[in-house]
Amino acid sequence: MNKLLNELELNYLLINSTNKFLVEYPELSENARYTLTGFTGSTGDALITNDNIYLFVDGRYHIQADLEANNNVTVVKLQIGQNQDDEIRKLIDPDKVLGIVGTKVSQARLETFKRYNIKLLEVDPINNYSETHTKEYIKSFEPVYYAPEATFITNLEEVSYLTGLRDFSKDNTAKIWSKLFINGKERILFNNDDDCNEFLSNYDGELIVDKNTINAHDYALIKKPVHRSSEIKMMMSVKSDEELEAYKKAFERTDMAVNSIRDYIENNNGLSEYDISLKLKEEFIKYGAKSLSFNSIVAVNQNSAQAHYAKSSKDVILRDGDLVLIDCGAYYESGLATDITRVFVKGTPNELQKRVYTTVLKAFLNCFNSDFKTGIEYDTFAHSLLDNAIEGFKFNHGLGHGIGINVHEAPPNLSQNEIAETEIKNGMCFTIEPGLYNPNCFGVRLENSCYKKDGKIVSFAKIGYEKKLINYNLLNEQEKKWLTNFNVL
């Protein structure tokens, strides 16, 4: 790493987990942070210094990072309320040179480092990969939105939403990998970087961009950039009646796939995490899935304490009395991502398993039936129910996230951040997923994808909860009544 820094004439190098489109789940071949550290989680960046490599991860990934990160990597475990970039800045001398890959950082994030001596790199020195593009060039489409002023859009979810186009050729996504120029009824969809770069370099007028989603390389090509926060995210967040109907149909099939895997677990012995994961994908495809919306999490016992357990093992076998957590979802023809988490038990559960499961179920029922205005309020309420509820078990992530073309969309967001201050409106779709985790025992997370209708929360997911894991003595009368609205298997 010292040799690399010297060759680049740097003192520090920031390595992102994203790609040039700034997506959350790039292919691992595009994820320089993975190449550098061995960590496969969806978020968390790395900083190379003269004497260390630092990996920054939030509470979802504390255990996973310890298990996956290379021995030469120092894992910085962010606590609730800590900001990754604030912790990165603490390690940097502002008078020394910090390298940042221009194609893999948003303009807005780059500007938060403006008091530092930045060297913007055109090529990722960790992953100098060849880019691939959609084969066919789409010449015409009818957008759902006409920008009255010249606007350049690079966020893949926004481009897919505006064009109504979907691409299922890549794993875990339905987005089209293109950039979009709109000026009134004029529109140009770019699938080729050379064409796009030439257009931007030669465009003489003002061009509206969102610094939060355009990469620094593209921004530098524009002669007269005008920053304006995108209105499209808010448009996308409120789903139309047609989108809600498409989602209902998608979740009907997701429920069937998960129900099938429940029966598979009940009726077969000696299954590994890997066996269950393969069978789950088969079931999704059987019910019409075009792709998984993310790599399914199938985690037995202690592995289920990792909120985003990365790789289902052939060596971890589900035995009598074991818990298995399954977090999964899929894309169907509408190109909307489904997301659900359930916990099953093989055989007879013990009292601790029942207590933890029931405590998480109580939190779900109370959150689902509450009437708060913002995601922050929901998240605060959930933590008041689960923090310190059971000794040794922690709820170390936000309550939920928006869903749509991407499995993680915002707004809405049910967590402790600025976006979560957005009002949750009718038509917004989101998850409610409380959990409790103990790395020495197991974890339980129960996740339903929901939407708001007429001021009330409605669940897309209809698959029920595990009767043998519920301790009814821990439920009050109101919670028992609420539970009757869901299937108990």
Each model region followed by its residue ranges:
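Active-site neighborhoods and metal-handling regions in enzymes and metal-associated proteins
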Residues: 1-489
